[in-house]
Amino acid sequence: MSGELNGNDTSAQAAVSAGSVLEGAAFADEGEQHNESMKTLVLGALGVVYGDIGTSPIYAFREALHAAATNGILARSDILGVVSLIFWALTLVVTVKYVLFVLRADNNGEGGILSLMALVRAALKGRPDLILGVGICGAALFFGDAVITPAISVLSAMEGLEIVAPNLTPFVVPATVVILVTLFSVQKLGTGRVAIVFGPIMALWFVALGASGLWHIFDDPTVMAALNPYYAVRFLTVSPAVAFVTVGAVFLAMTGAEALYADLGHFGRKPIVRAWLWIVFPCLLLNYFGQAAFILSHGEAAALPFFQMIPSFALWPMVLLATAATVIASQAVITGAYSVARQAVQLNILPRLEIQHTSEKLHGQIYIPRVNLLLGLAVVILVLGFEKSSNLAAAYGIAVTGNMLVTTVLLYIVMTRIWNWRVSRALPIILGFLVIDMLFFSANIIKVHEGGWASIGIATVLVLIMWTWVRGTRHLFQKTRKAEVPLDLIVEQMAKRPPTIVPGTAVFLTGDPKSAPTALMHSLKHYKVLHENNVILTVVTASKPWVASADRARLSQYNERFMLVTLTFGYMQQPNILRALGLCRRLGWKFDIMTTSFFLSRRSLKASVHSGMPLWQDKLFILLARTASDATEYFQIPTGRVVEIGTQVNI
């Protein structure tokens, strides 16, 4: 699942450098991998993991300079201070925090905010709601990021047309909308066939970034003095008010850093780290320092420095390559949104969603129509509403900084509860990360009126939806449980007054195997019959991403008529009840689909003043329940073998 293979690797046998030292620290506990497999995984990581942070140079340095300018004037110390801040931010946040620490906090090979939440909740007794709330906030912020990334990325690339052909400026927004609508429209076809070129295109993009930056560093080689943290510290202290605003813009250079952890399960830690240390990080630095040197020698170039430093003969190819890179970055975010949505459904944070598999060979290739539609609409609305990437920049940082802040808080619990670090060892590290995270978060939160409201608004709506679903399902479970009859009592009553026995097997789905399922009660009440064999089936989602087939099913014979079956799936796995029940043959149950009927209860919910939730939340929960995907489709049960029994419940 982690995408890692065992073997030997000679690619790291180079002279001792900062990269090799960091890599050695990151992989101190891992064996070597096959060289060819490693190259393939590194190339794949370039196409999926680094699209977002890799396209940041298009707009990040420009926005930071605009924030740093005093009355529209930039001093040499301002330019050196900004590029120094970018260098040290990338070093401390991405290279130190994520590479050396966060990537180690995997949940059975999987990463991402919900995986981290599940890992922490499993480690803490009682599975506290506080951690669940933190995870929900992190997931909501991720979706906010997923809305803004395609909008700002593609829009910033298309703004290159303003340099190539100024007369095409009015077409920047329409062209961006066309590209994004096309991108979201083709999602249902799957990306398996075209994804193979994502890696090579992004590799070419990073080469172009590095080459263009290196070329212009020679315009003013003294720009390399900004590697000294003195320039960053001086910039922060000379004019704190200006520096504080600038820090918020500097953070744009790190948007996408959370993808290193989110995509951990797709490639494994080693390919992600090697791609960063040996390709992405050096090329990003070369480009940022190249932009700084170009502006130092061409003071008027601060409007769109990324494209202005490209030679005229290479402008069109660069605009096209930038557009391709931003589309790939957007695709990676969209795919990530599908993955997080599926995890949220499995962890019961969101209602069931229709999930379509777009590839027979690649299990991870999924398409969620409802997520795609809502995400696409939100992205297009943002582009039409903000019109310029500089306007969207204010909205971008809040979601990502918030997500990083949540990650740091959960990382502390992992360090102390799972890695068993002493508080005296973990706390100084976490406090250092928190200081940096809080600085970036506070510098971005002040931009609420400039566009940050969009990010906060999206996250707030999603938090309300997810918390309402969690709270509503708990209230519903407690209410129905009070009305249910213990299975022991029903079996005892049937022993005294046996119902009519009919041939075949009946499978009753329930969330509580100790209580008689509602469908069973209604079947006995209205039809007065009991099947020859009855299975009380419970589907459980584990706190880990994957559960092996050998551990999928547990059987226990209750009596001659009843059997209890529990199916366990990881939160990254799509439940397939039919296939899972087939595994029960090895455990002694001769499962035959042709003689089996599945009984499901479909609840009709009505709001109640005694639900324990506000009326508006009752109505929202009922709406979410009505829009939930059908259980038959979600659990992949043959429709011809399903009997649904309706019940009305007041919540």
Swiss-Prot record:
Q: Which GO terms describe its molecular function?
A: potassium ion transmembrane transporter activity; symporter activity
Q: Which reaction does it catalyse?
A: K(+)(in) + H(+)(in) = K(+)(out) + H(+)(out)
Q: How does it sit in the membrane?
A: Multi-pass membrane protein
From the Swiss-Prot or TrEMBL record, state where the protein is found: Cell inner membrane
Q: Name one GO cellular component term.
A: plasma membrane
Keyword Zinc attributed: no
Which InterPro entries does this entry report, sorted A to Z? K+_transporter, K_trans_C, K_trans_N, Kup
Membrane-crossing segments per the record: 41-61, 82-102, 130-150, 163-183, 194-214, 235-255, 276-296, 309-329, 366-386, 395-415, 426-446, 450-470
- Keywords, alphabetical: Cell inner membrane, Cell membrane, Ion transport, Membrane, Potassium, Potassium transport, Symport, Transmembrane, Transmembrane helix, Transport
Q: Which PANTHER family match?
A: LOW AFFINITY POTASSIUM TRANSPORT SYSTEM PROTEIN KUP, OSMOTIC STRESS POTASSIUM TRANSPORTER
Checking HAMAP family in the record gives:
Kup (MF_01522)
Q: Which family does it belong to?
A: Belongs to the HAK/KUP transporter (TC 2.A.72) family.
Function recorded in the entry: Transport of potassium into the cell. Likely operates as a K(+):H(+) symporter.
In Swiss-Prot or TrEMBL terms, this protein is called: Probable potassium transport system protein Kup
Q: Which gene encodes it?
A: kup
